[in-house]
């Protein structure tokens, strides 16, 4: 009879997972990772909890996560309560002054605090900010102004969040920012995350979405492209393989990579713990686009 202690299959799997993760933990310790949090992962309670635990774990092993969020579903709920009709053009919310008041209230006053509380509850040390705080983000009017108070990023100054990261805090940033006159603007959270990642010289930009990643055939989830170069990503847009709502997300990744971010990831936030699966495993789970610095 063997006197060696028995290990069950789940025990062995846990050890294998930890062993596989160790080189990635060592590699990314002290590196900055900007995470755009949105989609189903904000709506379903089980997915919210998984994201909070993933982000808190990243911070606990020495990675420096920054969370940027939108809050579309809750904004729509409040607009409906106030009898304000949500209007969209080309995927962007038309934002009149009344709508802007609701957007700011929901993103800064409600969603941001919910995320901060959720991260703190699972052991993180989160701090809530908006683009206005410390002059973090300055906005400018998007396009010709026909969408109202919809903005683009004019400037990013990450100096307010660097000391927070140095002290082990997790900055949580809502995508509302003022222009040079102090007028608040509603900015797409993907855009804010990408520009912030570039300004911070981040290791990674991660977009949590409601799709598996970039697909060669948008109707076939099995056609997931797990890795692309910067030039290949541009070619897929030009060829129409990347289309619809995936175009602005891919373009956001391309802009960030062109400004020095080493890798950008488009992940399925509907998969529990997709963040950890992508960052700390060999196979990953979504699409990774590599910048020229990473390829070199």
UniProtKB/Swiss-Prot annotation:
NCBIfam families: argB. Pathway: Amino-acid biosynthesis; L-arginine biosynthesis; N(2)-acetyl-L-ornithine from L-glutamate: step 2/4. One of its GO terms (molecular function) is ATP binding. One of its GO terms (cellular component) is cytoplasm. One of its GO terms (biological process) is arginine biosynthetic process via ornithine. It comes from Synechococcus sp. (strain RCC307). The gene is argB. Keywords: Amino-acid biosynthesis, Arginine biosynthesis, ATP-binding, Cytoplasm, Kinase, Nucleotide-binding, Transferase. This is Acetylglutamate kinase. Catalyzes the ATP-dependent phosphorylation of N-acetyl-L-glutamate. HAMAP family: ArgB. Substrate binds at residues 71-72, 93, 186. The record marks 36, 249 as: Transition state stabilizer. SUPFAM superfamilies: Carbamate kinase-like. Gene3D superfamilies: Acetylglutamate kinase-like.
């Amino acid at each position: 009879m063997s006197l060696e202690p028995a290990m069950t299959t789940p025990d062995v799997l846990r050890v294998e997972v930890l062993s596989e993760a160790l080189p990635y933990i060592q590699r990314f310790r002290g590196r900055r990772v900007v995470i755009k949090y949105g989609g189903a992962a904000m709506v379903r309670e089980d997915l919210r909890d998984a994201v909070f635990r993933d982000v808190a774990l990243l911070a606990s092993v020495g990675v420096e996560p920054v969370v940027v969020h939108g809050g579309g579903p809750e904004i729509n709920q409040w607009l409906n309560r106030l009898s304000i009709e949500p209007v969209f053009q080309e995927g962007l919310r038309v934002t009149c002054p009344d709508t802007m008041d609701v957007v700011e209230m929901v993103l800064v006053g409600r969603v941001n605090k919910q995320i901060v509380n959720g991260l703190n509850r699972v052991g993180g040390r989160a701090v809530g900010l908006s683009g206005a705080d410390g002059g973090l983000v300055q906005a400018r009017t998007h396009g010709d102004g026909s969408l109202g108070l919809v903005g683009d990023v004019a400037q990013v100054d990450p100096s307010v969040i660097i000391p927070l990261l140095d002290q082990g805090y997790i900055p949580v940033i809502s995508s509302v920012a003022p222009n040079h006159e102090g007028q608040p603007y509603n900015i797409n959270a993907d855009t804010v995350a990408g520009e912030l990642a570039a300004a911070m010289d981040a290791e990674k930009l991660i977009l949590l979405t409601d799709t598996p990643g970039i697909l060669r055939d948008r109707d076939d989830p099995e056609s997931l492209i797990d890795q692309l170069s910067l030039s290949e990503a541009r070619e897929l847009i030009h060829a129409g393989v990347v289309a619809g709502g995936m175009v602005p997300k891919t373009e956001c990744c391309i802009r960030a990579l062109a400004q020095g971010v080493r890798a950008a990831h488009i992940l399925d936030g509907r998969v529990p713990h997709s963040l950890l699966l992508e960052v700390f495993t060999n196979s990953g789970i979504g699409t990774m686009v590599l910048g020229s610095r990473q390829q070199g």
